[in-house]
A protein has these predicted regions:
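Phosphate/dinucleotide-binding and metal-coordinating scaffold of catalytic cores
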Residues: 1-153
Length: 153
């Protein structure tokens, strides 16, 4: 796989890099990081993705990763807002995977190197953001914005 024809997202579990999700020719592929596999007490992402050094191909890993995304109308609205196909699991994970429900997150880079900042809002700014929600579900594509998606399935 070359960088030119493969896209990758880091897969993080409880803040530690557990593996890499790749996309090549429309097919997903997940591989655990060697460091994660050697970690005492390492936890698999799922029973369907046991701790193995071999990569998991599309059929084995897609159900787990697609299951991290919102479903139904919310998914359609996020896809439309981000101008991504509703069926593009990888594309949606690349945009909102940093805010998956649960302990797993997906990032194109290392979130530890990102500079986290808090932007305190005035009441009128908060009202404006809330007004955006019907057109911009979960404020998708808002630069640097991170939310908790717990329960947003």
């Amino acid at each position: 796989m070359t960088a030119a024809d493969t896209m990758e997202l880091g897969v993080w579990l409880l803040g530690e890099r557990a593996g890499t999700l790749g996309l090549k020719n429309g097919r997903l592929r997940f591989r655990y990081e060697a460091r994660w596999l050697q970690k005492p007490g390492a936890t698999p992402l799922s029973q369907s993705l046991p701790l193995l050094a071999e990569p998991f191909e599309d059929q084995a890993c897609r159900p787990f990763f697609a299951g991290l995304l919102p479903e139904g109308e919310l998914r359609r609205r996020i896809a439309a807002q981000c101008q991504i196909s509703y069926a593009n699991d990888f594309g949606l994970l690349a945009v909102i995977g940093g805010d998956c429900a649960g302990a797993v997150s997906l990032e194109p880079g290392d979130p530890a190197t990102a500079v986290a900042a808090v932007e305190w809002l005035e009441p009128d700014q908060l009202i404006a953001l809330l007004a955006e929600l019907p057109q911009r579900p979960m404020l998708a594509q808002r630069d640097g914005l991170r939310l908790s998606l717990a329960g947003a399935q």
